[in-house]
């Protein structure tokens, strides 16, 4: 056998470099990754709904029910429940922020945006009908209207959250239907059962099944 050349024993074999991928292929790969991320985000559910916050809303609603029942003034009755609505929104946002932070979840995610945009229209209609009923002295309709529209909003928003949330919305719609046709003497009981009892019951379920 012929002896090998010394250079061939010392110098490593140099392989040709792989040609870079064309820019079109890189752009297509980035588009595919972006599509996958957006699809996964759209299919995700919003799990930061706080069961403890929902229960706290139920407790404040019971306090509002007692205060409203003790007042003999119609404007005060409406004012108490308007304050309760604002307080409930604040409690809900704050407790969701705490739960999202504790679980390392983004609060303003794609499912969260869908929840807001699904929940807001029925609430806006409820505010408008409150003004109409107050103007025309149809305050006996307000408990039923409030719970029906709140239930519609919860059902619509709950499709992007955990499964128990839409069920809670249906329960509010059921109590709202009863309140709409019930005699005026049932107003306090319906408000306590709906905004108080249902929030407490479903809040406990959410806290137990979905981590707080």
Please provide the spans of the model-predicted regions.
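Membrane-helix interface and helix-disruption motif detector
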Residues: 73-79, 133-141, 183-188
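Cytosol/matrix-facing amphipathic helices and coiled-coil assembly/linker segments
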Residues: 12-57
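Selected alpha-helical membrane-embedding segments in polytopic membrane proteins
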Residues: 44-132
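C-terminal ends of transmembrane helices
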Residues: 41-42, 92-110, 152-160, 202-210
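Helical transmembrane-bundle signal
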Residues: 58-68, 88-92, 123-127, 147-150, ...
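Terminal transmembrane helical module of multi-pass membrane proteins
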Residues: 156-212
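Membrane-proximal helix-loop-helix units in multi-pass membrane proteins
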Residues: 107-111, 115-168
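Hydrophobic core segments of alpha-helical transmembrane domains in multi-pass membrane proteins
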Residues: 80-86, 143-149, 190-198
């Amino acid at each position: 056998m012929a002896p090998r050349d010394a250079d061939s024993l010392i110098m490593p074999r140099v392989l040709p470099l792989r040609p870079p991928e064309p820019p079109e292929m890189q752009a297509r790969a980035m588009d595919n990754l972006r599509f996958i991320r957006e699809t996964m985000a759209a299919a995700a559910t919003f799990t930061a709904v706080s069961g403890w916050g929902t229960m706290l809303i139920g407790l404040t609603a019971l306090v509002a029910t007692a205060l409203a029942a003790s007042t003999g003034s119609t404007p005060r009755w409406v004012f108490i429940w308007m304050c309760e609505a604002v307080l409930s929104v604040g409690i809900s946002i704050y407790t969701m922020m705490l739960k999202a932070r504790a679980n390392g979840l983004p609060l303003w995610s794609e499912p969260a945006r869908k929840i807001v945009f699904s929940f807001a229209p029925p609430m806006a209609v409820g505010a408008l009908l409150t003004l109409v009923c107050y103007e025309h002295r149809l305050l006996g309709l307000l408990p039923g209207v409030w719970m029906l529209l709140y239930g519609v909003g919860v059902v619509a928003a709950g499709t992007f959250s955990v499964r128990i949330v839409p069920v809670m919305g249906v329960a509010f719609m059921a109590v709202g239907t009863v309140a709409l046709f019930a005699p005026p003497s049932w107003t306090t009981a319906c408000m306590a059962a709906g905004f108080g009892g249902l929030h407490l019951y479903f809040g406990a379920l959410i806290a137990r099944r979905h981590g707080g």
